A protein has these predicted regions:
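Hydrophobic positions on the alpha1 helix immediately C-terminal to the Walker A/P-loop
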Residues: 6-10
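Sensor-1/coupling segment of RecA-like P-loop NTPase cores
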Residues: 110-132
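A short helix-turn-beta junction within AAA+ P-loop NTPase domains corresponding to the substrate/partner-engaging
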Residues: 131-147
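Intrinsically disordered, low-complexity segments enriched in Gly and acidic/Ser/Thr residues
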Residues: 159-169
Length: 169
């Protein structure tokens, strides 16, 4: 099982949680966990587009970055998103140092503004982007995960993560 498979399974479990009212049925839907793929290269506008695509709402990719940011923030608040998982986070390294910093500052902004937990999943090289800024390095920890087999140890790992995460369903 690879990194992407593990996060997809996790995200499917928490992707959409209906809120029920005894008299009215489903009254709302929460998207506590949002899983996206990092843009192919470091680009803030593409990051917002990747977020918006997961809410299945109309938007114009040609809109200014500020409008896309506003839409993404609005939807993440509306759907009570608590965690943003970004697969292939090492793609950020494909941009210039300035572009990398802009994307990382955007992630920091999203984390602060929405009190959002951000999880980046990628290769070992992805950790390099954190070392460009002392504040980023202190904010985002790096955990190396060994290759796992689908056995009891792996299931225990998943259960321990489930207990640590502040998710309710």
């Amino acid at each position: 099982i690879g990194k992407t498979t593990v996060i997809r399974q996790f995200c499917q479990k928490f992707y959409s949680i209906p809120i029920y009212d005894v008299n009215m049925g489903i009254t709302d839907v929460q998207r506590l966990v949002l899983c996206i793929q990092a843009p192919v290269k470091a680009n803030v506008k593409e990051l917002y587009i990747n977020i918006l695509e997961h809410f299945f709402v109309p938007f114009r990719p040609t809109d200014p970055e500020s409008k896309l940011r506003h839409q993404a923030l609005h939807l993440m608040r509306k759907f009570s998103t608590k965690m943003l998982i970004i697969d292939e986070i090492h793609n950020i390294l494909s941009g210039t140092a300035r572009q990398q910093l802009e994307v990382m500052n955007t992630l920091k902004y999203l984390s602060n503004e929405l009190q959002l937990n951000i999880v980046g999943v990628g290769t070992k090289e992805a950790a390099l982007v954190l070392h460009t800024d002392a504040q980023l390095a202190s904010r985002f920890g790096v955990i190396d995960l060994p290759k796992w087999n689908l056995d009891e140890d792996f299931l225990r790992l998943l259960l321990s993560y489930k207990k640590l995460l502040p998710l309710k369903y």
